[in-house]
C-alpha cells in the first residue's frame, strides 16, 4: 500500500496531488438528490432479478454491477477484494486532527482511520462539536454474496475479464461502467470523466 501513498515533508496533508480538489458544499447526498430530481428511483431492486421487466422500460441500460454476474458467470467468477467498517462516536472535539490517516504498520489490523468532521473544512460549527465520529476501515477477503469493492489485478482475473469484455462488446443497448462493470480500479475523478465521455459519445 505504501507505493500508492504520497510521502511529503511539508504541511500539505492532501492525499491527491491534483491542483483542484473539493467536496460538494452540502455533501454528496444533497448533490445526488439534485441530480436525480425528476427521475424515478426504485430502491432495493436487484436488476439481475428483474432484468427482463426493467429492460422493457429503457432504450439503453447503464450497468455498474459486476460484469461477470450480468452474464451469470458463464466464463467463471471474477475475484474481488472487500472491506469492512467499524464506526465509533468519541466524546472528544478532535480525534486525529485530519480527515484520513492511512496506516501501513503490519501490526495494525485496519488500513485507514476516517474522522468525518474534518471533511467539513472551515465549518466551525461542525469542527467545534464536542464529539466526533470515526470509522476504521479493515481489508476483508471476498466471497460470493459479499460487497465487492476492488477488482483483483492479476493475470488470471485479467484474462477472465477480457472474455467478458469481448462478450459485452456485442451488446447494443447495454453500457458497462464503473469499477465493477469495467473491472478496473477507478478513482472518483476517473469515474466521472469516463461517465462524461460515455454520455457525450452516446449523445453524438
Each language-model region and where it sits:
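Aromatic-acidic/polar surface patches that form glycan- and anion
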Residues: 21-28, 102-106, 184-191
Amino acid at each position: 500500500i505504501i507505493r500508492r501513498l504520497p510521502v511529503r515533508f511539508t504541511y500539505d496533508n492532501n492525499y491527491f496531488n491534483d491542483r483542484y480538489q473539493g467536496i460538494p458544499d452540502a455533501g454528496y447526498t444533497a448533490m445526488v438528490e439534485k441530480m436525480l430530481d425528476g427521475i424515478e428511483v426504485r430502491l432495493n431492486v436487484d436488476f439481475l432479478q428483474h432484468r427482463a421487466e426493467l429492460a422493457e422500460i429503457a432504450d439503453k441500460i447503464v450497468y455498474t454491477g459486476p460484469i461477470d454476474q450480468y452474464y451469470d458467470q458463464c466464463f467463471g467468477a471474477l475475484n474481488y477484494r472487500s472491506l469492512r467498517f467499524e464506526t465509533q462516536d468519541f466524546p472528544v472535539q478532535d480525534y486525529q486532527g485530519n480527515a484520513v490517516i492511512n496506516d501501513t504498520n503490519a501490526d495494525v489490523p485496519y488500513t485507514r482511520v476516517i474522522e468525518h468532521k474534518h471533511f467539513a473544512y472551515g465549518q466551525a460549527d461542525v469542527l467545534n462539536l464536542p464529539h466526533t465520529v470515526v470509522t476504521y476501515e479493515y481489508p476483508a477477503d471476498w466471497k460470493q454474496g459479499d460487497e465487492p469493492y476492488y477488482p483483483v489485478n492479476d493475470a488470471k482475473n485479467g484474462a477472465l475479464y477480457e472474455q467478458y469484455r469481448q462478450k459485452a462488446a456485442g451488446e447494443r443497448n447495454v453500457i458497462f461502467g464503473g469499477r465493477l462493470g469495467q473491472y478496473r480500479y477507478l478513482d472518483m475523478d476517473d469515474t466521472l470523466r469516463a461517465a462524461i465521455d460515455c454520455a457525450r459519445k452516446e449523445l453524438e
